[in-house]
């Protein structure tokens, strides 16, 4: 009886203190039609970002009705990712309270989240905190594995422990478990007698791209209709509907891989639409006629843009509109090289040849484009692009990170092990961190060691190099492993390493302290190594700079985070594919505050395109 009184007192107190706000539903009407929205996605090997562009019709004002895609953490919804977020993916079930309360209300799906994976900071945090060693709970980026359509051997796991069983649950949950099979294939694409839901989640690594795109779609759908977005971009009484999904791709992506990417995007749209109840669950989704059965219009997919060309458009648009006030003729005339003869039939100063190098996480892409003005004048000039040359290499920032780990981090650890008395330190390192080829608990622990120990230290070295004083010959990094780790590895990883160290140490030796391992890196030596071709990235940079030099370009644009490294900049200046004053580093490029990814009047480093 007393507990009932306490409960009623508590409820009455909450009722007095917390006023439930008025709930307002927004729908399209004749006076407030739905506003079409285009979503541009750049899914990279290392980082991902997106741009939302609303079409306000006659009220359009350049790029002012745009917003960066914001990914919200579902486990800590008060946190939003930075606009440029990691492409890491982790399986994690979205929970919105206790399910049986929803069932008692008469609806078993009161809250539906059409995805069972997390991306960005939440995925990284889940991976760093993972304690289980059965199977895998995620991957560094689905983009790397688009071609791998073979079901995995071990079941995928959710990365959080079940409090009752102390094991990680299998990575399958409502609503997606009823929309795909064990291999990750959507059921609506299969014959009726083969439509079995998920029992053993052995999704191929390629289908994880479908999962990632489902999560990004769900985040985008929530954002475009959020009160905050509608108030910021205008016309808050009008709902928003996705019209087009635009995927930017690296130049180096083969045609077959592009088609797989398109298929994954199509599957993600279908799964999200069916999970939300917007399209009949068992109906096919392939044709436009079948998609018209949807309650909410189905967006179209466009995949015509390559990443290097996107970087050129950022620069071209901003120069013409902002810096030259729409006077495109003056813009072209001021930058055209006087030492290059104009093409036949083209007046001098009415054409530009622009090259761009986009150094991403997984690919280095280059594009050379000829831009021609028509016969108009002032603000009525039309610019016609013609792609002259395009190339891409699957060598980029990830390879630079690997080089740093192999050149500086691993040798520092091996040296300290030898000083501690371990005679065959190289053999110990090989057994701990080498690839045995087996899929077992040791393999999972090796992956977690790389993720939780070596990669954060490697990133710390690159970040220090990026912000260093290039004119200081003594600049460098002098720290311990512990100094460079913002978050210590999990207990499982530490036990894995410490047991191996203790076993290899001579009897009576002092305890080996991993966090006290000293690291000394000279940034001048790193720059010299890049110039000498000792970094993997140097070879593709030599190749693309040679091509750019052959075309006598007017401007060279450098985009992507690795392009900020002093060694990379020194190498490009040394190769000098265009005069140094004609190289534009987009990480320092000035734009208006309203420009997407603008921070303090400059484009945020990384996804300059």
Task: Please provide the spans of the model-predicted regions.
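Glycine-rich phosphate-binding loops at beta-strand->alpha-helix junctions
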Residues: 239-260, 553-572
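Conserved phosphate-binding/catalytic loops in two-lobed NTP-binding clefts
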Residues: 270-306, 310, 572-606
């Amino acid at each position: 009886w007393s507990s009932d009184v306490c409960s009623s007192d508590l409820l009455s107190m909450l009722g007095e203190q917390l006023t439930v706000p008025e709930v307002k539903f927004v729908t399209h009407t004749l006076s407030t039609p739905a506003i079409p929205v285009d979503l541009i996605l750049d899914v990279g090997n290392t980082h991902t970002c997106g741009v939302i562009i609303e079409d306000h019709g006659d009220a359009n004002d350049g790029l002012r009705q745009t917003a960066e895609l914001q990914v919200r953490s579902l486990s800590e919804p008060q946190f939003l990712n930075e606009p440029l977020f990691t492409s890491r993916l982790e399986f994690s079930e979205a929970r919105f309270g206790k399910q049986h309360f929803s069932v008692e209300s008469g609806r078993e799906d009161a809250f539906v989240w059409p995805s069972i994976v997390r991306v960005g900071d939440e995925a990284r945090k889940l991976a760093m905190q993972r304690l289980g060693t059965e199977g895998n709970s995620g991957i560094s980026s689905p983009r790397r594995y688009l071609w791998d359509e073979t079901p995995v051997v071990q079941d995928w796991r959710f990365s959080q422990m079940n409090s009752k069983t102390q094991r990680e649950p299998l990575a399958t949950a409502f609503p997606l478990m009823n929309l795909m099979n064990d291999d990750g294939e959507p059921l609506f694409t299969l014959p009726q007698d083969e439509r079995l839901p998920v029992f053993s989640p052995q999704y191929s690594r390629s289908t994880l791209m479908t999962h990632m795109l489902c999560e990004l779609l769900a985040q985008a759908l929530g954002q475009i209709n959020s009160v905050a977005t509608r108030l910021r971009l205008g016309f808050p009484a009008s709902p928003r509907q996705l019209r087009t999904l635009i995927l930017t791709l690296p130049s180096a992506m083969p045609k077959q891989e592009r088609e797989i990417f398109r298929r994954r995007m199509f599957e993600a749209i279908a799964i999200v639409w069916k999970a939300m109840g917007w399209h009949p669950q068992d109906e096919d989704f392939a044709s436009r006629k079948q998609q018209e059965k949807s309650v909410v219009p189905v967006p179209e997919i466009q995949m015509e843009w390559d990443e290097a060309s996107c970087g050129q458009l950022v620069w071209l648009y901003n120069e013409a509109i902002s810096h030259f006030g729409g006077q495109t003729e003056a813009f072209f005339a001021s930058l055209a090289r006087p030492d290059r003869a104009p093409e036949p039939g083209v007046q001098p100063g009415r054409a530009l040849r622009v090259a761009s190098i986009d150094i991403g996480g997984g690919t280095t892409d280059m594009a050379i484009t000829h831009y021609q003005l028509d016969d108009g004048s002032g603000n009525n000039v039309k610019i016609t692009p013609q792609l002259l040359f395009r190339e891409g290499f699957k060598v980029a920032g990830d390879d630079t990170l690997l080089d740093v780990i192999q050149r500086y981090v691993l040798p520092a650890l091996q040296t300290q092990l030898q000083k501690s008395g371990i005679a065959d330190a190289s053999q110990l390192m090989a057994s701990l961190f080498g690839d045995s080829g087996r899929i077992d608990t040791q393999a999972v622990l090796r992956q977690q060691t790389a993720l939780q120990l070596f990669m954060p230290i490697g990133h710390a070295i690159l970040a220090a190099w990026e912000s260093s004083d290039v004119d200081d010959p003594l600049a460098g990094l002098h720290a311990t492993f512990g100094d460079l780790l913002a978050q210590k590895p999990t207990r499982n990883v530490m036990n894995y390493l410490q047991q191996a160290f203790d076993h290899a140490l001579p009897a009576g030796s002092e305890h080996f302290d991993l966090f006290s391992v000293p690291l000394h890196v000279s940034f001048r030596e790193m720059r010299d190594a890049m110039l000498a071709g000792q970094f993997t990235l140097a070879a593709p940079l030599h190749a693309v700079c040679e091509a750019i030099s052959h075309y006598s370009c007017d401007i060279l644009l450098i985009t992507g985070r690795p392009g900020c490294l002093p060694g990379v900049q020194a190498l490009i200046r040394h190769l000098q594919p265009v005069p140094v004053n004609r190289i534009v580093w987009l990480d320092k490029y000035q734009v208006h505050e309203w420009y997407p990814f603008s921070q303090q009047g400059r484009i945020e480093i990384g996804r300059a395109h």
